[in-house]
From Swiss-Prot:
Mg(2+) binds at K201, D203, E204. It comes from Crucianella angustifolia (Narrow-leaved crosswort). The lineage of its organism: Eukaryota, Viridiplantae, Streptophyta, Embryophyta, Tracheophyta. This is Ribulose bisphosphate carboxylase large chain. Belongs to the RuBisCO large chain family. Type I subfamily. The gene is rbcL. Binds 1 Mg(2+) ion per subunit.
Length: 453
C-alpha cells in the first residue's frame, strides 16, 4: 500500500454514532445577520428531552447524518452546520416546544426557493424520533433576499398599469368552475367586467380540459376584456391560468397571453412547483405581464396545527419566488386571534419591514429591502354584506374576490358585479369621510342600495 493511502490503526478518523447535542445544540451561539433563522414547533416522542430533538432537527436539515463519516474531516462542519440555539415551551402544550435553528447562508443556492425548502423542510419531517414537526416561521436575511427577483411588478407598478388608486381591486371567479364552453365562459367574463369588476378569474381547476381547451378560452376571454374596456373606459383583466403539465407548455401559454395583449396570467404555485413559478415570474417581468397566484393544495401543508408548515412561510416563499397577487383567505367571521394571525402574514406580503410580533404569529423581524410587495386576495364565501368589514380589515392594497357573491345575484352576473362595485365605492367613501365601517356598515350598504341603479 502506498504511503498516500495507508491508514494507521488508532490515528485520525474514529467511527461511531455521536449524540446530536454534542455538535448541533449550541445555546451560546449568537446569530448572524446572514443566517437563515427557523422556528420549528417540535412534538417529540415520549420521554425524549427537548434539546435532544431540537439538535436533531438542526442536524437532519443541514450537515448531519445518523453516524460519523470519515468525509467529515474534509470540510468545516462548524462553518456549514445548522445550530439549535434556543428552545422554549409552547404555552398550554405540555408535549410541544419551539426550537430555533440558525442555518449558515452558504448552505443555500442563490435565488432558489426549491433548494431552500429541500434542506429546511426535507427529510427531517419524516424523522422517527419526532411525533410531529411544524415550521412556524423563517427569517430570510437581506443577503439572501437580494438574490431573488421577487414579484414580477409589485403593488405600485400594478396600480400604475391599471390606473386604479385609492381602493381595493374587485375580482370574481367564474362559476361553474368546470363544464362551460369557451364561448359561454367568455360571456360570463364580459358580463362581470362590464358590470364594474376589475378582474375575473379562471378557477384553479381550469387548465386545458376536453370541454374547454386553453387556447379557445384565452381567445374568448381576450374578446371579453377588450369589449368591456371599450364600453367602460377602464382597464380590465382576466386571470388566464397558464398552469400546465410541463414548464415548456406553461411558458407557451403565457407567450400566447402576451401576444393577445392581456394584462395578467395565473399560476397554481404549489401544485405547479416553485421552480416553475419562478420561471413564470421571470417571464412575466420581462414581458410586462402581471402574475396572479393561487394556493391550491396549501391546506395539505398548513392545516394541521402541529405538523407541516404555517402559511406565513408559504407566503414568504411566494414573495421570493414571484407573484403579484396571492390568495390569503378572509378573516370575516373568524375568531379575533385568527384575524391577528392572518393580518400578520398579510403584512409580510405587502410591507417592506415587519417587526417581530408573536401575538400576530411573527417570530422574526423581516426586512424585505427593495423586494416588491404582493397584493393579498381575500376570497372564500364572501358577499356584498361583507364589504364594510373587508374594506376596513384589508385596506386599499388588496383584491376582494367574489365568486358566488357576484354570479349568485338573483338578477344575473352583471347586476351582481354592479352590486359589488357600488358597495365597495360606498364603503370607501364612508371610510374617507370618517364613518365607522364596523358600526355603520349595514346602514352604509342599505343607503347604497337605495340610490344604486
Amino acid at each position: 500500500m502506498s504511503p498516500q493511502t495507508e491508514t494507521k490503526a488508532g490515528v485520525g478518523f474514529k467511527a461511531g454514532v455521536k449524540e446530536y447535542k454534542l455538535t448541533y445544540y449550541t445555546p451560546e451561539y449568537e446569530t448572524k445577520d446572514t443566517d437563515i433563522l427557523a422556528a420549528f414547533r417540535v412534538t417529540p416522542q415520549p420521554g425524549v428531552p427537548p434539546e435532544e430533538r431540537g439538535d436533531a432537527v438542526a442536524a437532519e436539515s443541514s450537515t448531519g447524518t445518523w453516524t460519523t463519516v470519515w468525509t467529515d474531516g474534509l470540510t468545516s462542519l462548524d462553518r456549514y452546520k445548522g445550530r439549535c440555539y434556543h428552545i422554549e415551551p409552547v404555552p398550554g402544550e405540555e408535549d410541544q416546544f419551539i426550537a430555533y435553528v440558525a442555518y449558515p447562508l452558504d448552505l443555500f443556492e442563490e435565488g432558489s426557493v426549491t433548494n431552500m425548502f429541500t434542506s429546511i423542510v426535507g427529510n427531517v419531517f419524516g424523522f422517527k424520533a419526532l411525533r410531529a414537526l411544524r415550521l412556524e416561521d423563517l427569517r430570510i436575511p437581506v443577503a439572501y433576499v437580494k438574490t431573488f427577483q421577487g414579484p414580477p411588478h409589485g403593488i405600485q407598478v400594478e396600480r400604475d398599469k391599471l390606473n386604479k388608486y385609492g381602493r381595493p381591486l374587485l375580482g370574481c371567479t367564474i362559476k361553474p368552475k368546470l363544464g362551460l364552453s369557451a364561448k359561454n365562459y367568455g360571456r360570463a367574463v364580459y358580463e362581470c367586467l362590464r358590470g364594474g369588476l376589475d378582474f375575473t378569474k379562471d378557477d384553479e381547476n381550469v387548465n386545458s380540459q376536453p370541454f374547454m381547451r386553453w387556447r379557445d378560452r384565452f381567445l374568448f376571454c381576450a374578446e371579453a376584456i377588450y369589449k368591456s374596456q371599450a364600453e367602460t373606459g377602464e382597464i380590465k383583466g382576466h386571470y388566464l391560468n397558464a398552469t400546465a403539465g410541463t414548464c415548456e407548455e406553461m411558458i407557451k401559454r403565457a407567450v400566447f397571453a402576451r401576444e393577445l395583449g392581456v394584462p395578467i396570467v395565473m399560476h397554481d404555485y404549489l401544485t405547479g412547483g416553485f421552480t416553475a413559478n419562478t420561471s413564470l415570474s421571470h417571464y412575466c417581468r420581462d414581458n410586462g405581464l402581471l402574475l396572479h397566484i393561487h394556493r391550491a393544495m396549501h391546506a395539505v401543508i398548513d392545516r394541521q396545527k402541529n405538523h407541516g408548515m404555517h402559511f406565513r412561510v408559504l407566503a414568504k416563499a411566494l414573495r421570493m419566488s414571484g407573484g403579484d397577487h396571492i390568495h390569503s383567505g378572509t378573516v370575516v367571521g373568524k375568531l379575533e386571534g385568527e384575524r391577528d394571525i392572518t393580518l400578520g402574514f398579510v403584512d409580510l406580503l405587502r410591507d417592506d419591514y415587519i417587526e417581530q410580533d408573536r401575538s400576530r404569529g411573527i417570530y422574526f423581524t423581516q426586512d424585505w429591502v427593495s423586494l416588491p410587495g404582493v397584493l393579498p386576495v381575500a376570497s372564500r364565501g364572501i358577499h356584498v354584506w361583507h364589504m364594510p368589514a373587508l374594506t376596513e380589515i384589508f385596506g386599499d392594497d388588496s383584491v376582494l374576490q367574489f365568486g358566488g357573491g357576484t354570479l349568485g345575484h338573483p338578477w344575473g352576473n352583471a347586476p351582481g358585479a354592479v352590486a359589488n362595485r357600488v358597495a365597495l365605492e360606498a364603503c370607501v367613501k364612508a371610510r374617507n369621510e370618517g364613518r365607522d365601517l364596523a358600526a355603520e356598515g349595514g346602514e352604509i350598504i342599505r343607503e347604497a342600495c337605495k340610490w344604486s341603479p
